[in-house]
Amino acid sequence: MNIDMANSDDKALISEDTAHQISADPWYQVGFVLTTGVNSAYVLGYSGSVMVPLGWIGGTCGLILAAAISLYANALLARLHEIGGKRHIRYRDLAGHIYGRKMYSLTWALQYVNLFMINTGFIILAGQALKATYVLFRDDGVLKLPYCIALSGFVCALFAFGIPYLSALRIWLGFSTFFSLIYITIAFVLSLRDGITTPAKDYTIPGSHSARIFTTIGAVANLVFAYNTGMLPEIQATIRPPVVKNMEKALWFQFTVGSLPLYAVTFMGYWAYGSSTSSYLLNSVKGPVWVKAMANLSAFLQTVIALHIFASPMYEFLDTKYGSGHGGPFAIHNVMFRVGVRGGYLTVNTLVAAMLPFLGDFMSLTGALSTFPLTFVLANHMYLMVKRHKLSTLQISWHWLNVAGFSLLSIAAAVAALRLIMVDSRTYHLFADL
């Protein structure tokens, strides 16, 4: 089986039918899709969720190492996009082709959990941004976080009704980048100003020895979460041939230029506030009300766009399996179908987000339950299965080491994340106003 697309037929068959548009986007558009995920408003939490538990040395080394291993694992997965003369446009299609039907179902379950949790986190994040904006003008406790989360879910649903598939984002990716630059620049500048005026910062890693163990493991899961989508084959399905060469360009863009804003705001936030950094950086910064309001509203709007990327595999599944398959994407019956089906999906997302608004815990649990297995364990093992006759003993040992190591990390991170959720659940009630 040759998975090197440099010499393969660009007109390879597609693994299964799909109701969504594929093979239409240039590599740089896909690069911006990936960068939109990396620089989503989640970056405003990494100073608190990664740097505070790990400190300067652990956090810095962790971010760089996580980027390197994520680029490597995603490149492996990208090279598996075509096997047996077919382009496998879904992660589950690829796993099913290599392992069989049971693994198809397991991969789909893992991916569903991954994307559902990410989308839940996005809705929590959007709700936090809305509440932070309201509090700047009226801190009267009237507009509570669950109400903001409900409003965020409604806006996300409206956006989902109007964007039929991932490739249709196009100009919205430009808006997403613009919004990202606004809140990242404001957070960076205000943190820099606060850091200069604040005399001494405490960078001590908080918590008891046992608590630090769990928070460190959770931070490692957050590192993995920061760079990975868990849906690379679905994103790669939108790219023009040659699909591997173009996808590698998009990945290099994501992990070089595309990740610079993440590093800048994460390091600056931790430098300015130390171990007291909030899990939502804009809650820590001081500055003019209108500037902070603009940053929060930009974070809210960018989150609405970013959520659509991570919800697109579920939308594609629903549209392909249950949609009419007739008429254009904006035919009235197709629009009404999206309103009913996508609206229902996002309603469940929003309900879970409002019930358990513990953003950092969701990031950790998502990284543990699905990002580790999908991005690192499966990618390395699938590459072994496909290329085992062409790999040296050393290469085989390396991939098995990755499979075993990341499996253990996944289990440890899941335990740590569940512990954090249980602790927070005892501290806060359902539908808490955090």
Swiss-Prot record:
<feature type="transmembrane region" description="Helical">
    <location>
        <begin position="297"/>
        <end position="317"/>
    </location>
</feature>
<keyword id="KW-1003">Cell membrane</keyword>
<feature type="transmembrane region" description="Helical">
    <location>
        <begin position="106"/>
        <end position="126"/>
    </location>
</feature>
<dbReference type="GO" id="GO:0015171">
    <property type="term" value="F:amino acid transmembrane transporter activity"/>
</dbReference>
<dbReference type="GO" id="GO:0016020">
    <property type="term" value="C:membrane"/>
</dbReference>
<keyword id="KW-0029">Amino-acid transport</keyword>
<dbReference type="InterPro" id="IPR013057">
    <property type="entry name" value="AA_transpt_TM"/>
</dbReference>
<feature type="transmembrane region" description="Helical">
    <location>
        <begin position="362"/>
        <end position="382"/>
    </location>
</feature>
<comment type="similarity">
    <text>Belongs to the amino acid/polyamine transporter 2 family. Amino acid/auxin permease (AAAP) (TC 2.A.18.3) subfamily.</text>
</comment>
<keyword id="KW-0812">Transmembrane</keyword>
<dbReference type="GO" id="GO:0003333">
    <property type="term" value="P:amino acid transmembrane transport"/>
</dbReference>
<dbReference type="Pfam" id="PF01490">
    <property type="entry name" value="Aa_trans"/>
</dbReference>
<keyword id="KW-0472">Membrane</keyword>
<feature type="transmembrane region" description="Helical">
    <location>
        <begin position="251"/>
        <end position="271"/>
    </location>
</feature>
<dbReference type="GO" id="GO:0005886">
    <property type="term" value="C:plasma membrane"/>
</dbReference>
<keyword id="KW-1133">Transmembrane helix</keyword>
<feature type="transmembrane region" description="Helical">
    <location>
        <begin position="49"/>
        <end position="69"/>
    </location>
</feature>
<feature type="transmembrane region" description="Helical">
    <location>
        <begin position="339"/>
        <end position="359"/>
    </location>
</feature>
<feature type="transmembrane region" description="Helical">
    <location>
        <begin position="26"/>
        <end position="46"/>
    </location>
</feature>
<feature type="transmembrane region" description="Helical">
    <location>
        <begin position="403"/>
        <end position="423"/>
    </location>
</feature>
<feature type="transmembrane region" description="Helical">
    <location>
        <begin position="149"/>
        <end position="169"/>
    </location>
</feature>
<feature type="transmembrane region" description="Helical">
    <location>
        <begin position="213"/>
        <end position="233"/>
    </location>
</feature>
<protein>
    <recommendedName>
        <fullName>Probable proline transporter 2</fullName>
    </recommendedName>
</protein>
<keyword id="KW-0813">Transport</keyword>
<comment type="function">
    <text>Proline transporter that mediates proline transport across the plasma membrane.</text>
</comment>
<feature type="transmembrane region" description="Helical">
    <location>
        <begin position="171"/>
        <end position="191"/>
    </location>
</feature>
